[in-house]
Amino acid sequence: MTSVLLGGFTAVFLALAPTGALAEARFEKWIKTFYPEAAKAGITAQTYNAAFAGITSPDPDVLQKAQYQPEFTTQIWDYLDSRVNPYTVKMGKEAAAKNMRSLQNIEKYFGVDRNILMAIWSMESNYGAVLSKTEKLHYVPQALATLAYADPKRAGYAKKQLIAALKIIQAGDIKPSEMTGSWAGAMGHTQFIPTSYLIYGVDADGNGKRDIWHSVPDALATAANLLHKNGWENGRTWGYEVVAPGRAGSLAGKTKTIAEWEKLGFRRPGDRGFKFKDERATLKMPAGEGGPAFLLTKNFYVIKRYNASDNYALGVGMLADQLGGSTGLVQSWPRPEGALDAKEKFEIQSRLKALGYYSGEVDGNLGSGSKTAIEAFMKRKGLNGEPEPSKTLLQHLRR
């Protein structure tokens, strides 16, 4: 048997983790001692060595990123503003047109709405744009080894995913050097973790490999396969925005048939009707009685098999609806006084770009590029205060 890879590891680690030579020795020992567990799962020494060749340290960013998951920590209106907006709709329609034949074939074979698949692609990798930003990607075996070594809460998960990742490499679906993904090991256009890839991966383009990194058809078909196998009901929606009767908050979380909800006074905005009156739906009021209300059907919970966050599933459903021609929510979120809404965020970016301060995409995401532009604008105008987007800033931009 080929000897298992042993190498020097220079650890650049977070607080509470060992540093310097001690971290190097401990991580090196972990890599060595994990091999027997991988071997029991059928991983050869050749595959193991190839996967860890050139790895000289744990991934220093993984544990930091593990502390922040926006779908669970961001206010729902901010989360949705950045993911369901005119930019993501425009880009989605363009991407769908480029991949229409594949989408038609996938929709026909798996019985999953193409707009849902496009929305997932957007939410997961911005229609693949994230995959070209190498500075944001992680080498999956290294990221998972880092979690297994240094994150006790996620060690079991990481070990299971690492073995699955090694199986993917061993099967020849992807070269080790090309197995990139998120800090948690989510991979490719549609961000599948390794175990889910092994269960649901599809070779849709017929080249003999399930390649969700380079093949859009493979990635979208793999997403469709997951939804299909978890009970997606073709021809039915994920849910409805509804106008609730007064004092409906006590009903939040209850499940009834659509017909029963109608009898209680729930209706769709614009008095549009419900298609399936016998369908069961759960009332959700994510921001309480002061915000939008939704009746969520079985397909909403199928989307949650992809990502367990309600915010995520709501974003997928809302974006899919707008890709299909919907105009979006009728009711407004109860934003704090002075908070920007989605249109105002777009306007700030648009005006900064028109004035020559901002050169990026007008996508409503007021990130570091936008803040640099705001700082330059404020300096030029002699404005005091922090370079943050605000209604006051927008007033200055409008002058």
Regions found by a protein language model. Name each.
Residues 48-72, 121-125, 135-142, 241-246, ...:
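Acidic helix-start/capping segments at beta-turn-to-alpha-helix junctions
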Residues 1-9:
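Bacterial N-terminal signal peptides that target proteins for export
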Residues 24-109:
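An acidic, Gly/Ser/Thr/Pro-rich helix-cap/linker signature
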Residues 32-48, 53-60, 108-111, 122-129, ...:
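Sec-exported extracytoplasmic/periplasmic mature domains
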Residues 77-228, 238:
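Acidic/His-rich structured neighborhood in mature extracellular/periplasmic domains
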